[in-house]
């Protein structure tokens, strides 16, 4: 579509169609924006041993692929946090089960007219 439109524009402007073909082919490839991560650099010398461990996307500061951040939480501290969090939710669930009034009264209490049939059931008039 873009190639046809640029071809029509080239004929209107009096061109020979070479520009239309080059514009059409570049618009079909990535809309003329280029590569998403910059130009590919062809290595001209041997790569370093740890080259695959660096993420180099063409910016000024390549970064390591493996984050080498010091351990901030040890395994036993993480286990304590996990146990505490799960214990909190278990306690909250048990509190909800113990405080559940609907499970203690599985049906709604009946309400009768005339003061809940107090006189009819043998109460004082």
Curated annotation (Swiss-Prot):
Accessory subunit of the mitochondrial membrane respiratory chain NADH dehydrogenase (Complex I), that is believed not to be involved in catalysis. Complex I functions in the transfer of electrons from NADH to the respiratory chain. The immediate electron acceptor for the enzyme is believed to be ubiquinone. The chain crosses the membrane at residues 78-98. The keyword Transit peptide applies. It is found in: Mitochondrion inner membrane. It comes from Arabidopsis thaliana. Complex I is composed of at least 49 different subunits. InterPro entries: Put_Complex_I_su8. The lineage of its organism: Eukaryota, Viridiplantae, Streptophyta, Embryophyta, Tracheophyta. PANTHER family: NADH DEHYDROGENASE [UBIQUINONE] 1 BETA SUBCOMPLEX SUBUNIT 8, MITOCHONDRIAL (PTHR36401:SF1). Residues 1-29 form a transit peptide. Its main location: mitochondrion. This is NADH dehydrogenase [ubiquinone] 1 beta subcomplex subunit 8, mitochondrial. It comes from the Eukaryota. It is a single-pass membrane protein. The keyword Electron transport applies. Keywords: Electron transport, Membrane, Mitochondrion, Mitochondrion inner membrane, Respiratory chain, Transit peptide, Transmembrane, Transmembrane helix, Transport. GO terms for cellular component: mitochondrial inner membrane. Belongs to the complex I NDUFB8 subunit family.
